UniProtKB/Swiss-Prot annotation:
Role: One of the proteins required for the normal export of preproteins out of the cell cytoplasm. It is a molecular chaperone that binds to a subset of precursor proteins, maintaining them in a translocation-competent state. It also specifically binds to its receptor SecA.
UniProt family annotation: Belongs to the SecB family.
GO molecular function: unfolded protein binding
Gene transcribed to yield this protein: secB
Any one biological process term the GO annotation gives: protein tetramerization
This protein's name: Protein-export protein SecB
A UniProt-annotated Pfam family: SecB
PANTHER family hit by this protein: PROTEIN-EXPORT PROTEIN SECB, PTHR36918
Subunit structure: Homotetramer, a dimer of dimers. One homotetramer interacts with 1 SecA dimer.
Gene Ontology CC entries for this record: cytoplasm
Keyword Thylakoid among record annotations: no
Source species of the chain: Anaplasma marginale (strain Florida)
Length: 175
């Protein structure tokens, strides 16, 4: 599969999903039910921060294997704060993880890009679903996260940014 890696055409190794799961989940609805009346009069301000990290997992070869497959845990962390007229509507924190392996060996930089660009793209639809269901279950309209450009986020990390992609959503229909 060809792709443009930060302006350079290259090959990205194929990732294999070994598992995915919610590692940490927190939702606070501190000012209910009065906040529901406030939202009907004034749209909430929603701030979203996203962070991606990866870690190598220690794996021992099974019997008969000469070397174990390299496994990596990729964490997609999303923090959301919704405020209406300076009153917190809700706070949401989610760490959603996936365990990945690469189908072939690759140089370290290419592996890093696969883990911090491709892998979070695989996890993101599940993160979006969890957040939409959670906000709806808390009595708010489902919050549908906008698509995230993980390649641009990775490029900003290389440029010395803190690695967080911050979005502001001020639409009244979102939550």
């Amino acid at each position: 599969m060809r792709y443009c890696r930060l302006g350079v055409s290259s090959m990205r190794p194929k990732l294999k999903v070994r598992g995915q799961y919610i590692k940490d989940l927190s939702f606070e609805n501190p000012n209910s039910p009065k906040v529901f009346l406030m939202i009907s009069k004034s749209p909430p301000e929603i701030s979203i921060s996203v962070n991606v990290s990866s870690a190598s997992l220690p794996v021992k070869p099974t019997e008969g294997e000469q070397a174990a497959a390299d496994l990596y845990e990729v964490t997609l962390q999303v923090n959301i704060e919704s405020v209406v007229e300076k009153v917190p509507a809700f706070l949401c924190e989610l760490k959603y993880c996936g365990v990945f392996s690469l189908e072939e060996k690759a140089e370290e930089q290419v592996v890093k890009e696969a883990l911090l660009i491709t892998a979070p793209g695989v996890l993101f639809p599940f993160v979006r679903e969890v957040i939409a269901k959670m906000t709806a279950s808390a009595g708010f309209p489902p919050l549908m996260l906008d698509v995230i450009d993980f390649e641009a986020m990775y490029a900003s990390q290389l440029g010395g940014d803190d690695g967080k992609n911050k979005q502001a959503n001020k639409s009244g229909g979102a939550a």
